[in-house]
Structures are given as C-alpha cells and as structure tokens.
C-alpha cells in the first residue's frame, strides 16, 4: 500500500530541504508550486481562463503570464485573489491527483505531495499522513527577510497571510523541527519514516 504524505510548513520553514531529502531516499515528490506554474502555461485551460477573467494586461509581451503583475493584482484584492484560486486550485488539484495515481499504480512505497498551503487549500483529503516542517518564529522571520530581501514589515505581513505554524503543527501527524542542523533534520525524517514503515 502506497503511503501518501502531505508535506507542508510555514513560509521559509525549510520545507524544500526536507523535500530534497525525500528525493534522496528515492521517494517521489509531487511539487504543488511547480505544477501551479505548469498549469498556467500559455495555451493551457487555466491560462485561457485567467486571460478571460483578468485581461491581457497580466501577460508579458511573449504572451506568457506575467506572474509578478498578476501577483500584485490579487495581493491587494481579496475578490480577485479568490477568483484566481478558483481557476488555479482545481487545475493543480487534478494534476497532482493524476501524478499521485500514477505512482500508486507503479507500486511505490510512498509518495510525497509537497503543498505549501495544504491546510489553507483544504487538501488534506488527498493525503494519508501530514508532515509539517516547523521553525521558531524568529528563525522564520530572519530566513524570509534574507531569502526574499524583505523588510521586517513585508516579511511579517507575508507570514501572517498564512495559517500560523502553531495551528499547522496542531493538525500534523508528525512534525520536523528545522531550527538545528541539516543532519538533525535528516535524523528526524528518517525516524518518522521508520515509524511509518516506509524505510527500514
């Protein structure tokens, strides 16, 4: 039986590090962010719907989606953000499901759905187990400021726009504390996978 693991965490909690560790263990990872980019490529159904709803001003000169422009349109407008999610989320959901079923058919021991907004998008029904990568609030703030060149205000606003890490931790089957070393994170992951009988 393939175990479907939902991998999530707060912004800048180091989820991609853990995602990479799964890959090193030969466990396939389906990345929602990559799929979200693919489903809105020029000519795809979700792309056509976005152009229909938001107009051609959210396109680059070559006709591809201008992500930063679309991002700023929806970031300050709740109604538009919901409209965009209504187009993109089902398309991402469908493609993730398709890939998941493919790995299950292949008889994989486990498959990981890497979904930053697993709880916010109410996608927990797609997975059997939820693994949350968590860090202390000050670590999260520092990492985000450094990674995205954000001011403290910008970073705080971005963190607050998501469900709190505390809340995610409460709803997790297992939690990896990613404040320490990479080795420490790896040890925690291996212990969890042994507990779930995914690795020996």
Curated annotation (Swiss-Prot):
ATP binds at residues 12-17. It is an enzyme of class 2 (transferase). Its EC number is 2.7.1.24. It comes from the Bacteria. It is found in: Cytoplasm. One of its GO terms (biological process) is coenzyme A biosynthetic process. Residues 4-200 form the DPCK domain. Pathway: Cofactor biosynthesis; coenzyme A biosynthesis; CoA from (R)-pantothenate: step 5/5. It catalyses: 3'-dephospho-CoA + ATP = ADP + CoA + H(+). InterPro entries: Depp_CoAkinase (IPR001977), P-loop_NTPase (IPR027417). One of its GO terms (molecular function) is ATP binding. SUPFAM superfamilies: P-loop containing nucleoside triphosphate hydrolases. Its main location: cytoplasm. Keywords: ATP-binding, Coenzyme A biosynthesis, Cytoplasm, Kinase, Nucleotide-binding, Transferase. One of its GO terms (cellular component) is cytoplasm. Belongs to the CoaE family. Catalyzes the phosphorylation of the 3'-hydroxyl group of dephosphocoenzyme A to form coenzyme A. NCBIfam families: dephospho-CoA kinase. This is Dephospho-CoA kinase. It comes from Bacillus cereus (strain ZK / E33L). The gene is coaE.
């Amino acid at each position: 039986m393939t175990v479907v693991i939902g991998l999530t965490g707060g912004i800048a909690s180091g989820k991609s590090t853990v995602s990479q560790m799964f890959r090193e263990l030969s466990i396939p990872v389906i990345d929602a962010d990559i799929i979200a980019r693919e489903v809105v490529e020029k000519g795809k159904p979700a792309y056509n719907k976005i152009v229909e709803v938001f107009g051609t001003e959210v396109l680059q000169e070559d006709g591809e989606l201008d992500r930063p422009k679309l991002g700023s349109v929806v970031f300050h407008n709740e109604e538009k953000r919901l409209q965009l999610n209504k187009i993109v989320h089902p398309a991402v959901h469908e493609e993730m499901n398709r890939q998941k079923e493919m790995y299950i058919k292949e008889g994989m021991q486990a498959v990981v759905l890497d979904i930053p907004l697993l709880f916010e998008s109410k996608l927990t029904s797609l997975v059997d187990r939820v693994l949350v990568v968590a860090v202390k609030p000050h670590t999260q703030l520092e990492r985000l400021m450094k990674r995205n060149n954000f001011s403290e205000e910008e970073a705080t606003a971005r963190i607050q726009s998501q469900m709190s890490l505390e809340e995610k931790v409460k709803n997790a089957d297992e939690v990896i504390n990613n404040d320490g070393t990479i080795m420490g994170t790896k040890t925690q992951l291996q212990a969890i996978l042994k507990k779930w009988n995914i690795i020996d």
